[in-house]
Swiss-Prot record:
Alphabetical keyword list: Calcium, Cytoplasm, Cytoskeleton, Metal-binding, Motor protein, Myosin, Phosphoprotein, Repeat
Post-translational modification: May be phosphorylated by let-502 or/and pak-1 and dephosphorylated by mel-11 to regulate its activation and myosin II-mediated contraction.
Subcellular location: Cytoplasm; Cytoplasm, Cytoskeleton
Other comments on record: This chain binds calcium.
Entry-linked InterPro entries: EF-hand-dom_pair (IPR011992), EF_Hand_1_Ca_BS (IPR018247), EF_hand_dom (IPR002048), Myosin_RLC (IPR050403)
Residue positions binding Ca(2+): D40, N42, D44, D51
GO biological process: embryonic body morphogenesis; establishment of cell polarity; locomotion; meiosis I cytokinesis; mitotic cytokinesis; nematode larval development; post-embryonic development; protein localization
The organism of origin for this protein: Caenorhabditis elegans
Protein's name in the database: Myosin regulatory light chain
Expression by tissue: Expressed in the spermathecal and uterine walls. Weak expression in gonadal sheath and intestinal muscle. Not detected in vulval, pharyngeal or body wall muscles.
Cytoplasm among keywords: yes
Documented effect of changing S18A: Partial defect in embryo elongation
Gene Ontology terms: cellular component: cytoplasm; filamentous actin; myosin II complex
Modification Phosphoserine occurs at: S18
Amino acid sequence: MASRKTVNRRQRPQRATSNVFAMFDQAQIQEFKEAFNMIDQNRDGFIDQEDLKDMFASLGKEVTEQFIDSMINEAPGAQPINFTMFLTLFGEKLTGTDPEEVIRNAFQCFDEDNSGKLNEEHLRELLTTMGERYSEEQVDELFRDAPIKGGQFDYVEFTRMLKHGTKDKDEA
């Protein structure tokens, strides 16, 4: 009887992690798969301590064993991370970002007519001159896939894109 409960407990998290695929669209899952494959240096289908060390080394970063262990320990059971667990961990991290309302409110501070849109050039100026300043190249990159029509940056749609991904594959 106790072993049956143990088996059931192990199955529940598996079902929960498989639902992670519903959190992302196909394009996002493909991007995560590419990232996973880049980290999985030995191509065994799992990310382990050695894969993480190799990845950081390839980026020119020196990290401690404790840092690597803390990353692996984020996975339940502190075992090598398969793709489903990788997606689950990213899903948890992404849901840990600011809620849509908080992001939208940050933009809304500059939206004098409460239209949900900001003038593209005005936003560019704000991003390059205030707070943590962005370079022109960074702003260009940000604006590349941003919802801008008629010189108006739609921050409501942009916030949705940040939290839920783009729909450009569906619209094409």
